């Protein structure tokens, strides 16, 4: 649910009435989050509080901690998007593009409505709190529906996907309803095309069960865990950097995307990676990047390699 802290139409929104306004906002939170008819049968995945405040608006101080406490009391582990170092932060732009590197850690004293956009986009490897940078963008040119505008092309959505989800962070794609409260047919068609593309992208894991050689920390973190397809296992090593791993796919496979994932239960630790493929007996670069995080999608040339 998106409930902006700035209510431009409320007569209570004034520095002389901060206590009244904060109570007013808190009452709205309680009304929405405690009603079983709202959300998904009363459950909410995320409460979205942006940092917007119009030019010339009163600089009312918000009682964020009281609001956050109420959200947690009523919705448990519901994610909170805000400027205040909560579980989700803004990525620093409204294009849906995350940075590389992208650390999901930040320092609280560098956040707030005046936070540097570059800091939000890349995070901080020395950060003291875990706050995921959420990439947000609209399927249309703006956040609201206009009849004379069209949705983004499939190619544009694919680029956004690889620069957000493909860089280890969630994508919030805005779909504005029209004046009848319905999604436009063109938007719906584009969403189906986008879903078809993603389904095709993940249709087959060519590396599933592939033989992997390289150093490993222990049997509990063996190399085979890299390709066993299980969410509960992972590989790790304490060897000196750079660490090299080699995958044998068993037979030549044709591909142009490689997916890497990191076991975030152990923290976000990968700071750089480099992928090569052997083509006709010669090793050549496929691609490289910095952080991995929850998921990294690396695009390269279409190759046939084992």
Predicted regions and their residues:
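Short loop/turn segments at connectors of secondary-structure elements within structured domains
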Residues: 241, 254, 267-271
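Non-catalytic extracellular/lumenal accessory regions of secreted precursors
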Residues: 231-235
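Mature catalytic domains of secreted/periplasmic carbohydrate-active enzymes
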Residues: 1-225, 238-239, 259-261, 268, ...
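Tryptophan-centered short beta-strand motifs
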Residues: 283-285
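Short, surface-exposed beta-strand/strand-loop-strand elements in extracellular ectodomains
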Residues: 268-281
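Non-catalytic surface loops within mature trypsin-like serine protease
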Residues: 5, 139, 177, 251, ...
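Hydrophobic/aromatic beta-strand segments within beta-rich folds
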Residues: 210-212, 230, 243-262, 275, ...
């Amino acid at each position: 649910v998106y409930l902006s802290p700035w209510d431009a139409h409320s007569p209570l929104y004034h520095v002389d009435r901060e206590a009244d306004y904060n109570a007013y906002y808190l009452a709205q939170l309680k009304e929405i989050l405690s009603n079983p008819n709202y959300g998904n049968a009363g459950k909410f995945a995320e409460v979205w509080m942006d940092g917007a405040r119009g030019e010339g608006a009163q600089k009312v101080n918000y009682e964020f901690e009281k609001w956050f406490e109420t959200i947690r009391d009523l919705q448990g582990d519901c994610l909170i998007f805000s400027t205040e170092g909560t579980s989700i932060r803004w990525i620093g732009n409204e294009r849906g593009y995350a940075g590389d590197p992208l650390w999901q850690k930040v320092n609280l004293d560098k956040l707030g409505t005046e936070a540097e956009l570059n800091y939000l986009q890349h995070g901080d490897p020395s950060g003291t709190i875990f706050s995921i940078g959420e990439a947000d963008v609209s399927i249309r040119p703006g956040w609201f529906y206009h009849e004379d505008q069209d949705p983004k092309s499939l190619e544009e959505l694919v680029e956004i996907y690889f620069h957000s989800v493909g860089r280890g962070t969630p994508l919030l794609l805005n779909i504005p309803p029209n004046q009848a409260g319905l999604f436009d047919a063109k938007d719906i068609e584009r969403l189906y095309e986008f879903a078809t593309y993603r389904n095709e992208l993940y249709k087959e894991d060519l590396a599933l069960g592939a033989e992997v050689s390289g150093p490993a920390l222990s049997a509990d973190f063996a190399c085979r865990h890299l390709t066993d397809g299980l969410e509960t296992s992972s590989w790790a090593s304490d060897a000196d950097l750079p660490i090299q791993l080699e995958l044998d796919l068993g037979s030549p496979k044709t591909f142009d995307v490689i997916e890497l994932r990191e076991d975030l239960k152990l923290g976000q630790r990968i700071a750089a990676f480099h992928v090569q493929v052997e083509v006709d007996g010669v090793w050549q670069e496929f691609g490289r990047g910095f952080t991995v995080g929850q998921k990294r999608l690396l695009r390269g040339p279409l190759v046939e390699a084992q």
